[in-house]
């Protein structure tokens, strides 16, 4: 079964800790990490978009949502605003390009417990909020615009000050995040194990 909720892969970050664009790193049998994510998430969602600064950096076909050109920043805030402007749906599933081990069961659980009365339904692992893994509702659109105006880009702060429902998970490996070169190498080893 494919979910109707649109999925957004956020791939517009600066990747400064990685030293190169992590979305474009080879991953498994795929030319890029973002293609790996796109392939796997397309088995879960009917519609998958890639949120990015510039779609021209990708040499494959996909549904892209580019950040608003007047926003010269590398923060998810810009991506979220563009997504809200582009989509007509009330909600969407947000996932970061650098978390390739999020499982179908995690996504299903988040989608099943989500309610229209929530502003967001977000994963938590060992008490730590995972703001780039969860469902965001249109009710947060105005708050994202305010954050941008205030040059505030902390998703955790936004979620703590909104009607957010958290879902606790225990499997830390599923939330493994690729920020540094050694984490990329660890992820490749995990993928091949």
Curated annotation (Swiss-Prot):
The cross-references to CDD domains, in alphabetical order and at most eight, read: MobA
One GO location term (cellular component): cytoplasm
Q: Where is it chiefly localized?
A: cytoplasm
Q: Where does Mg(2+) bind?
A: 98
Q: What is known of its domains?
A: The N-terminal domain determines nucleotide recognition and specific binding, while the C-terminal domain determines the specific binding to the target protein.
Which of this chain's residues are annotated to bind GTP? Answer: 10-12, 22, 67, 98
* Protein name (record): Molybdenum cofactor guanylyltransferase
Q: Output one GO BP term.
A: bis(molybdopterin guanine dinucleotide)molybdenum biosynthetic process
**Which family does the entry's similarity section mention?**
Belongs to the MobA family.
Cofactors needed by this protein, per the record, are: Mg(2+)
Q: Recorded E.C. number(s)?
A: 2.7.7.77
Q: Where in the cell is it found?
A: Cytoplasm
Tell me the keywords, alphabetical order.
Answer: Cytoplasm, GTP-binding, Magnesium, Metal-binding, Molybdenum cofactor biosynthesis, Nucleotide-binding, Transferase
- Give the reaction(s) catalysed: Mo-molybdopterin + GTP + H(+) = Mo-molybdopterin guanine dinucleotide + diphosphate
Q: Which InterPro entries match?
A: MobA-like_NTP_Trfase, Molybde_CF_guanTrfase, Nucleotide-diphossugar_trans
- What is the annotated quaternary arrangement, including any partners? Monomer.
Q: What does this protein do?
A: Transfers a GMP moiety from GTP to Mo-molybdopterin (Mo-MPT) cofactor (Moco or molybdenum cofactor) to form Mo-molybdopterin guanine dinucleotide (Mo-MGD) cofactor.
HAMAP family hit by this protein: MobA
Which gene produces this protein? mobA
Q: What's one GO MF term for it?
A: GTP binding
């Amino acid at each position: 079964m494919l979910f109707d909720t649109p999925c957004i892969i956020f791939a517009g970050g600066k990747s400064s800790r990685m030293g190169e664009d992590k979305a474009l790193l080879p991953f498994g049998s795929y030319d890029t990490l973002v293609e790996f994510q796109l392939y796997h998430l397309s088995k879960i969602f009917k519609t998958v978009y890639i949120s990015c600064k510039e779609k021209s950096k990708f040499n494959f076909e996909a549904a892209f949502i580019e950040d608003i050109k007047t926003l010269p920043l590398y923060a998810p805030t810009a991506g979220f605003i563009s997504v809200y402007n582009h989509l007509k749906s009330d909600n969407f599933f947000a996932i970061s390009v650098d978390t390739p081990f999020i499982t179908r069961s995690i996504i299903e659980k988040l989608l099943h417990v989500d309610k229209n009365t929530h502003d967001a339904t977000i994963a938590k692992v060992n008490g730590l909020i995972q703001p780039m893994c969860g469902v965001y509702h249109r009710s947060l659109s105005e708050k994202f615009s305010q954050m941008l105006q205030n040059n505030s880009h902390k998703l955790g702060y936004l979620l703590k000050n909104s009607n957010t429902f958290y879902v606790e998970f225990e499997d830390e490996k599923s939330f493994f995040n690729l920020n540094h070169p050694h984490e990329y190498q660890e992820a490749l080893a995990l993928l091949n194990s």
